[in-house]
C-alpha cells in the first residue's frame, strides 16, 4: 500500500518541506508516503471561486486514480492515535493505495467530498494548510509506529 497526500498548493515555506520530509523518510519501504502538490488556482478580487474549486478537485481526483479517497475536512471524523492505527491496518488490508486530500483556502470541491470513502477531521479548528501536511505526516508515522511496536509512540 502506498499513501499519497494530495494537497492544493505549491511553494511552501521551508519549515513545511523540512517537517514533512522528516516524517516521510521514516516510513518503511513497503508503505511509501508520497506528496502530490496540485497547483492552486489563481485567486483575486474577481476570481470565480466555484470554478477554481472545481478545477482543483478534478486535478486531485485525477491524481488519486483508483486509490481510496479520504478527505481532510473539519466535519470529518476525529480519530485518536489508536483509531488512526486501526485505520492504517484496515487500509493495508483493503489492498488499495490511500489518497488523503487537503483542499486549498476554500476547502475541497463538492466532487472531492462526494468521492470520499472517509473523511478525517484533525481538529474543529481551521488549521493552516501548510501545517496540516506536517501534522498528517507525523500522525501517520506515529500510527504506523504503534502498529509495529516501534518505540516512537509512547503511552
From Swiss-Prot:
What Gene Ontology molecular function terms does this protein carry?
A: rRNA (pseudouridine-N3-)-methyltransferase activity
Q: In the Enzyme Commission scheme, what number(s) does this protein have?
A: 2.1.1.177
Q: Which reaction does it catalyse?
A: pseudouridine(1915) in 23S rRNA + S-adenosyl-L-methionine = N(3)-methylpseudouridine(1915) in 23S rRNA + S-adenosyl-L-homocysteine + H(+)
Which Pfam families does the entry link to? SPOUT_MTase (PF02590)
List keywords of the entry alphabetically.
Answer: Cytoplasm, Methyltransferase, rRNA processing, S-adenosyl-L-methionine, Transferase
Q: Which compartment or compartments is the protein found in?
A: Cytoplasm
User: What enzyme category does the UniProt record give?
Assistant: transferase
Chain residues that bind S-adenosyl-L-methionine: 72, 103, 122-127
Cellular component per GO, a single term: cytoplasm
Give the function comment from the record: Specifically methylates the pseudouridine at position 1915 (m3Psi1915) in 23S rRNA.
Family membership, please give it. Answer: Belongs to the RNA methyltransferase RlmH family.
- State whether it acts alone or in a complex, and with which partners, per the record: Homodimer.
Matching NCBIfam families: PRK00103.1-1, PRK00103.1-4, tRNA_RlmH_YbeA
Record protein name field: Ribosomal RNA large subunit methyltransferase H
Source organism per UniProt: Actinobacillus pleuropneumoniae serotype 5b (strain L20)
UniProt lineage: Bacteria, Pseudomonadati, Pseudomonadota, Gammaproteobacteria, Pasteurellales
Its gene is rlmH
